[in-house]
């Protein structure tokens, strides 16, 4: 038993590497039932009539891409499939490229036209000040879009003057922007808000769910996988759940087995 306690850590790393690689090669899907938190966002979007306006804030950067980009893509598929007009923006300077590529690629897949069915406003610094400005007049906050076009005559923004005119707003965040959207957006201008975040932030968002300040929550890769399942379009998030789940099981086994060996060795001594 003492030999097992002194096992080379490189052997453990090899087991973890195998636990990641083998599920990717075999490509098996684990069941991903949707939780009520994720279903809250799905049901809200599904209830919107055609032609509704939805704002998606891509408030994350490439460091959080693996968790949040699948959420963004799944949301966009749902919106474009339901003929909802999408307005994108970001309060994170690292999110512009990710947001633009996601909106453009998914929009083309559904034959949607830029300025007619969707628009990307781009990045603006200020966070809370930007939200307050958008709450008063969106054209004052973003007189031009990401590509330099004037926003005042865009069909995708017809009927939208401020945040209050959006039928739904979703913030995808790798930082503290969700709290800002609640305090300086929803509570001040009274619109429906949903949220997506990295797994490490997820537990901090549940009080906002319980207080009904957000309609729903997608947390981490699991949240993205649940949304992919709901829209019946399994992609990178669902594929990533298999290796993640196997690694989690392996780590739990190592912890239990290591503690068992430690106590058994102590009893012998």
PLM regions and their residue ranges:
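Hydrophobic membrane-insertion alpha-helices, especially the h-region
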Residues: 10-26
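Alpha-helical transmembrane signal-anchor/signal-peptide segments
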Residues: 30-47
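Short extracytoplasmic
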Residues: 42-70
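Short glycine-rich or small-residue beta-strand-to-loop segments that form or flank ligand, phosphate
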Residues: 54-61, 86-90, 169
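Membrane-embedded segments
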Residues: 63-119
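Structural recognition of alpha->loop->beta junctions
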Residues: 101-128, 211-229
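Membrane-proximal low-complexity regions enriched in glycine and acidic/polar residues
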Residues: 115-199, 203
């Amino acid at each position: 038993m003492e030999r097992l306690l002194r096992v080379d850590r490189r052997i453990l790393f090899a087991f973890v590497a195998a636990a990641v690689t083998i599920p990717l090669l075999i490509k098996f899907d684990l069941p991903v039932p949707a939780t009520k938190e994720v279903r809250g966002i799905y049901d809200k979007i599904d209830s919107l009539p055609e032609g509704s306006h939805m704002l998606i804030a891509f408030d994350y950067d490439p460091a959080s891409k693996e968790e949040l980009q699948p959420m963004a893509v799944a949301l966009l598929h749902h919106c474009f499939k339901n003929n909802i007009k999408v307005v994108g923006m970001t309060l994170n300077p690292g999110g512009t490229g990710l947001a633009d590529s996601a909106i453009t690629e998914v929009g083309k897949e559904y034959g949607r036209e830029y300025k007619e069915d969707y628009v990307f406003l781009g990045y603006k610094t200020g966070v809370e000040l930007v939200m307050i400005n958008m709450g008063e007049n969106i054209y004052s906050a973003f007189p031009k879009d990401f590509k330099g076009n004037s926003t005042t005559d865009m069909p995708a923004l017809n009927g939208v003057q401020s945040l209050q005119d959006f039928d739904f707003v979703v913030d995808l965040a790798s930082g503290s922007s969700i709290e800002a959207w609640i305090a300086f957006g929803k509570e001040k201008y009274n619109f429906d808000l949903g949220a997506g975040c990295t797994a490490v932030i997820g537990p901090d968002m549940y009080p906002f769910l319980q207080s009904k300040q957000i309609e729903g929550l997608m947390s981490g890769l699991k949240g993205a996988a649940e949304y992919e399942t709901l829209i019946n379009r399994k992609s990178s998030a669902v594929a990533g759940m298999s290796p993640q789940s196997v690694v989690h099981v392996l780590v739990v086994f190592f912890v239990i087995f290591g503690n068992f060996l430690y106590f058994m060795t102590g009893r012998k001594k």
